């Protein structure tokens, strides 16, 4: 039996001098021990998800904790059968979380070390979910929400996190005077966004400390009141959260049946994320629409070595046709 793989999720807002040089040093160490994952290092802190066997991940945690800036860094841990990443990336960026505030004329960025929402532990957050006078706001991307979310949470009409500040301003009158509690995967986005809400004038702003990942592991709440699965940005795509009464809420793009399997549309110019069973992925050549299924650069066709005749036959089976190739 192969050794279990540990997946570590973590972040910390802390000033890092010469962050670019530290990113290079960080990458060198990670590669030297065989760690895999994706890490962002910025002037404002560090944010990463990495995976490896017990010995490798322990070496990494010990090395990170040996730096006084990260001596109290909180690693959230999952055990898996396989690696969550294929390669190791450490990149320097201006911020570990980009709210788009400067781009969208929302004044300067937020420093969570100076202003952030009140921390709620899993038990307190569950109480907030059950409180009719509390607004629970999901701060993640739309495709993350569609795979799974807390029961009753508000789904902002946005495509990605950077659109959230404008959406909140547009809907301010709906919950400005109410208690607002926000949540995200591991907590890093909420640290910054809850601070922005405080600066915007919201009087009572809370955040799920440690994010959904921590809520699902809490021995008391055991992920209760979470519907679906949690989206993660690695090879796993999704992880279970609710250990009390788990449900599947996402539906197959093609037949509407319960499905938690995310794939990207095979048209490289679309690339939309859709839910699809393996059977329907093959049946519809992973195209989200007739146009994408017949697109000349359909990646499912090339990846699976389908001949043009085989491709045309699959489309014909679902009542669609493959355009003829023009010849000179």
From Swiss-Prot:
InterPro entries linked to this entry: Rhodanese-like_dom (IPR001763), Rhodanese-like_dom_sf (IPR036873), Rhodanese_C (IPR022111), TrhO (IPR020936), TRHO_N (IPR040503)
Keywords on record: Oxidoreductase, tRNA processing
GO biological process: tRNA modification
Entries under CDD domains matching the protein: RHOD_YceA
Reaction catalysis annotation: uridine(34) in tRNA + AH2 + O2 = 5-hydroxyuridine(34) in tRNA + A + H2O
Keyword tRNA processing appears in the UniProt entry: yes
Domain spans labelled Rhodanese: 130-224
Transmembrane intervals: none
GO molecular function, one term: oxidoreductase activity, acting on paired donors, with incorporation or reduction of molecular oxygen
Active-site residues (renumbered): 184
Record-listed E.C. numbers: 1.14.-.-
PROSITE patterns in alphabetical order: RHODANESE_3
Pfam family of the protein (one): Rhodanese
Similarity field: Belongs to the TrhO family.
Task performed by this protein: Catalyzes oxygen-dependent 5-hydroxyuridine (ho5U) modification at position 34 in tRNAs.
Designated name of the protein: tRNA uridine(34) hydroxylase
UniProt organism field: Streptococcus uberis (strain ATCC BAA-854 / 0140J)
């Amino acid at each position: 039996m192969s050794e279990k793989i540990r997946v570590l999720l973590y972040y910390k807002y802390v000033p890092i001098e010469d962050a670019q040089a530290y990113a290079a040093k960080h990458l060198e160490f990670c590669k030297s021990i065989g760690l895999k994952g994706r890490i962002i290092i910025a002037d404002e802190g560090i944010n990463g998800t990495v995976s490896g066997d017990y010995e490798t991940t322990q070496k990494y945690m010990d090395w990170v904790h040996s730096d006084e800036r990260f001596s109290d860094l909180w690693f959230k841990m999952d055990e898996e059968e396989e690696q969550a990443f294929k390669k190791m990336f450490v990149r320097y960026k201006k911020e570990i979380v980009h709210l788009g505030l400067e781009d969208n004329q929302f004044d300067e960025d937020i420093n969570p070390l100076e202003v952030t929402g009140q921390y709620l532990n899993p038990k307190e957050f569950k109480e907030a979910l059950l409180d009719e006078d509390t607004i629970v706001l999901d701060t993640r991307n739309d495709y993350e929400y569609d795979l799974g979310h807390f029961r009753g949470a508000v789904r902002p009409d946005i495509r990605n996190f950077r659109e959230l500040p404008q959406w909140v301003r547009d809907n301010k009158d709906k919950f400005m005077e109410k208690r607002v509690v926000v949540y995200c995967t591991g907590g890093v986005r909420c640290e910054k966004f809850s601070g922005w809400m405080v600066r915007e004038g919201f009087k009572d702003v809370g955040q799920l400390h440690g994010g959904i990942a921590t809520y699902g592991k809490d021995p008391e709440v055991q992920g209760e009141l979470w519907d679906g699965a949690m989206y993660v940005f690695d090879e796993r795509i999704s992880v279970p959260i609710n250990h009390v009464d788990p449900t599947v809420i996402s539906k197959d793009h093609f037949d509407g049946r319960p499905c938690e399997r995310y794939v990207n549309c095979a048209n490289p110019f679309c690339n939309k994320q859709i839910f699809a069973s393996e059977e329907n992925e093959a049946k519809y050549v992973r195209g989200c629409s007739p146009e994408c299924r017949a697109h000349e650069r359909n990646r499912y066709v090339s990846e699976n070595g389908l001949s043009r005749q085989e491709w045309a036959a699959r489309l014909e089976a679902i009542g669609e046709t493959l355009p003829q190739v023009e010849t000179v």
